[in-house]
From Swiss-Prot:
The lineage of its organism: Viruses, Riboviria, Orthornavirae, Negarnaviricota, Polyploviricotina. It comes from Maguari virus. Transmembrane segments: none annotated. Encapsidates the genome protecting it from nucleases. The encapsidated genomic RNA is termed the nucleocapsid (NC) and serves as template for transcription and replication. The NC have a helical organization. One of its GO terms (cellular component) is viral nucleocapsid. One of its GO terms (molecular function) is RNA binding. Its main location: virion. This is Nucleoprotein.
Amino acid sequence: MIELEFNDVAANTSSTFDPEIAYVNFKRIHTTGLSYDHIRVLYIKGREIKTSLTKRSEWEVTLNLGGWKVAVFNTNFPGNRNSPVPDDGLTLHRLSGFLARYLLEKILKVSDPEKLIIKSKIINPLAEKNGITWADGEEVYLSFFPGSEMFLGTFKFYPLAIGIYKVQKKEMEPKYLEKTMRQRYMGLEAATWTVSKVNEVQAALTVVSGLGWKKTNVSAAAREFLAKFGINM
């Protein structure tokens, strides 16, 4: 006869994960040999990667992104979603956010020719499908990447503003703001910054609301090609 065992497991009421510490560790361990081409693969194949992970039950999976290999904990598989991830562990979501910050740091300090290389290689499908491009601002464009909400200070509240805008326009359910609303801002807990930083959030929302939002199925590469013929989409 089969035996089914059940135990009462105490709920994890607080998280010890600190994105700032985790990001420093990520840069120290994983960025040697990392190229813009590797990062490009993660983002343009993001949906495909996520879909693949949801179909695999393995808890630890190594992603090979154009030759750059990185191990992630597979929280995308439904049966793994409640499994605790080590504070120094990577998930697809964390990896996306870390690389978004890594790119912003690069853009803010490299030469203009290298900036052009970054912007030519890195495409943000979630921004592009809404008609948002690099021309709308580097912090804004990178804030459309999943995981950027871990760094509300670095990205000037734009990840939150994007979420608020989508909820206001009925494009997203309010429940998807929960993760962002738990984040720190420049060391401040959410209970503090939600009171003291309302003006900053409103300023970010004003910028986001003023973007040329428009749904499009035309890729960034296709738009660039058509622009050569005077066609702007």
